[in-house]
């Protein structure tokens, strides 16, 4: 079957020569099927289709590497209205992280979560994201975070044509805000092991679907909600199945203190002790986690941090 050749011309092209990006204004990009065959200023070959990109930017797709598509369309407004505001309160992240987010998530039913995912994925595609990473929830969200919901969300991304990394979360315990503004932690009955097994099975069954556009990843919830055994088992499975890992860490001063009290270690030291540090680990947030030597450890292990 003949592959269609498409020429995009007259736009501002953000190109790359292998070492750095550069601008072509105007520029031309030509692709055949799913392969780019020309980037430059003038194309002399024939094309089956032409797109006039006058007044537009032609660029590689954006990578959005930390998303919660099933709840952000709901939680964003609440965070803006009643979340932590101002430098002092936002630095603690107490109300937003430990009260608003869990409560709003728990109030959403599975069908609403799918509608939110459809809305979020459509907005991402419309604004230039072609690769997205969605981090799901466990019992914190309505519907108890059943894997069937994760499967439905992954199917939405696959049918939309996005490249998607899907990671349902698991953890040993959950947290919340007490009336005195202290943070409580409560262990799950089985320390989250059954949820972990379900997430691993999802990763095995769904990795590589939709012509390879859907990938899976291991997502232990937060550094302060996962015991050492769960993190060590995460590393073992990641190595066995060659899966990436993303973990929430450095979200609040409370989290940093919690790890210090329970483990007598800094956040990074705890992750190192559990064997989690490595080039396949992405730390989400990472605002409150550093101590002398911690950044050097992350650099040595080629750990990525994003927010």
What are the residue ranges of the model-derived segments?
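Divalent metal-coordination and catalytic microenvironments
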Residues: 11, 29, 34, 55, ...
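Short, well-ordered secondary-structure micro-motifs within conserved domains or adaptor modules
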Residues: 48-53
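Histidine-centered catalytic micro-motifs
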Residues: 61-72, 244-253
């Amino acid at each position: 079957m003949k592959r269609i050749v498409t020429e995009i011309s007259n736009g501002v092209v953000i190109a790359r020569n292998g070492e750095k990006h550069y601008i072509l204004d105007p520029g031309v990009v030509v692709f055949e099927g799913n392969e780019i065959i020309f980037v430059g200023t003038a194309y002399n070959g024939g094309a089956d289709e032409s797109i006039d990109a006058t007044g537009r930017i032609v660029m590689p797709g954006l990578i959005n590497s930390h998303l919660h598509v099933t709840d952000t369309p709901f939680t964003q407004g609440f965070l803006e209205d009643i979340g932590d505001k101002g430098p002092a309160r936002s630095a603690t992240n107490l109300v937003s992280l430990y009260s608003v987010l869990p409560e709003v998530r728990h109030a959403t039913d599975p069908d609403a979560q799918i509608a939110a995912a459809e809305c979020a994925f459509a907005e991402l595609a419309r604004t230039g994201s072609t690769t997205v990473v969605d981090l799901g929830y466990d019992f914190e969200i309505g519907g108890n975070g059943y894997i069937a919901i994760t499967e439905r969300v992954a199917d939405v991304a696959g049918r939309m044509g996005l490249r998607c990394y899907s990671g349902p979360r698991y953890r040993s315990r959950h947290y919340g805000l007490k009336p005195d503004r202290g943070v409580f932690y409560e262990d799950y009955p089985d320390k989250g092991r059954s949820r972990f097994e379900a997430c691993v099975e999802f990763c095995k069954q769904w990795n590589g679907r939709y012509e390879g556009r859907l990938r899976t990843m291991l997502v232990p919830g937060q550094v302060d909600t996962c015991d050492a055994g769960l993190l060590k088992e995460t590393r073992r499975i990641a190595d066995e199945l060659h899966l990436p890992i993303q973990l929430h860490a450095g979200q609040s001063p409370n989290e940093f203190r919690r790890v210090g009290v329970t483990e007598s270690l800094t956040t990074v030291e705890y992750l190192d002790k559990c064997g989690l540090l490595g080039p396949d680990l992405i730390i989400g947030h990472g605002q409150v986690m550093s101590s002398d030597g911690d950044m050097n450890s992350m650099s040595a292990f080629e750990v990525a941090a994003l927010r």
